[in-house]
């Protein structure tokens, strides 16, 4: 009797598992089915915060259909907006909303598919992991230039920043340092990845990255008592936040339209969440 009960139970569990995995496969296939039978290329450039999501989405699409080729480059938000506006790429990513002037000049259509924060980071060996907003402004202006003034070692502070084409810099400049001056002694890096690498290799460095890019190689710095985490951004406690945009020149069509629609699909939004961002749906 026990053997019969075990067999029946096993069959029921097996059937449930089969139905579950079939449902998951159907949902995933449904999002990618739109690319079946398509051919062509999609060129993407711009914001570097977007790249992990872009790469994962592109990989899944190209695995589904090898007749589609998707190229992804960084360069920063300003580059993405300019290149899509000039027809050099199909999709230009930006970590800030394009300005009214850019929208008008390039006839841009904007698609915000996730929310991100910009967090201040230091080397994990640095014991200074909390600052006031006023202290941060003074650090980046060069007014405070030694860690000992903040309770750290008697070592010069090495400031790292991004160039003016960066959407990450734009948000940091506006929301973290109140459009204040950035010292001309600052070291420039070209991407979120390069910023992490620089800070992880400099015990006395300080910079800022997309919250979605923060990992064990750098240490987040609390500002006015609030640590830059995904949850704090989501709850509105951490105010240095921004949208992640994919922009097109005019209404998107063809593969560009399908790629953007994929970003808004349940699967695309899950990719965004998996990469450390807040889905909008």
How would you name each of these model-derived features?
Residues 29-281:
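Exported/periplasmic ABC-transporter solute-binding proteins
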Residues 11-14, 126-128:
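N-terminal hydrophobic signal/anchor transmembrane helix of membrane proteins
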Residues 12-25:
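Bacterial N-terminal signal peptides
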Residues 1-9:
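N-terminal secretory signal peptides that target proteins for export/translocation
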């Amino acid at each position: 009797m026990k053997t019969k009960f075990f067999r029946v139970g096993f069959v029921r569990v097996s059937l449930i598992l089969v139905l579950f995995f079939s449902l998951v496969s159907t949902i995933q296939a449904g999002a990618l089915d739109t690319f079946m039978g398509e051919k062509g290329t999609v060129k993407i450039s711009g914001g570097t915060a977007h790249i992990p999501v872009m790469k994962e989405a592109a990989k899944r699409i190209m695995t589904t259909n090898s007749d589609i080729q998707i190229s992804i480059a960084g360069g920063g938000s300003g580059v993405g907006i300019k290149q899509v506006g000039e027809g050099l790429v199909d999709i230009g990513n930006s970590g800030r909303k394009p300005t009214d002037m850019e929208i008008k000049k390039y006839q841009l259509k904007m698609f915000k598919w996730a929310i991100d924060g910009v967090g201040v980071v230091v080397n994990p060996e640095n014991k200074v992991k909390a600052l006031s907003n006023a202290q941060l402004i003074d650090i980046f202006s060069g007014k405070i230039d030694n860690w000992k003034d903040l309770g750290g070692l008697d070592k010069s502070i090495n400031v790292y920043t991004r160039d003016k084409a960066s959407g990450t810099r734009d948000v940091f400049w506006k929301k973290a340092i109140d459009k204040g001056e950035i010292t001309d002694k600052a070291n420039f890096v070209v991407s979120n990845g390069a910023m992490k690498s620089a800070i992880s290799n400099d015990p006395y460095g300080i910079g800022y990255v997309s919250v979605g890019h923060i990992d064990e190689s750098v240490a987040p710095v609390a500002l006015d008592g609030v640590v830059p985490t995904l949850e704090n951004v989501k709850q509105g406690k951490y105010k240095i936040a921004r949208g992640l945009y994919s922009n097109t020149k005019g209404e998107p069509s063809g593969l560009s339209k399908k790629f953007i629609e994929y970003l808004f699909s349940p699967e695309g939004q899950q990719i965004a969440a998996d990469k450390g961002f807040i889905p909008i749906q």
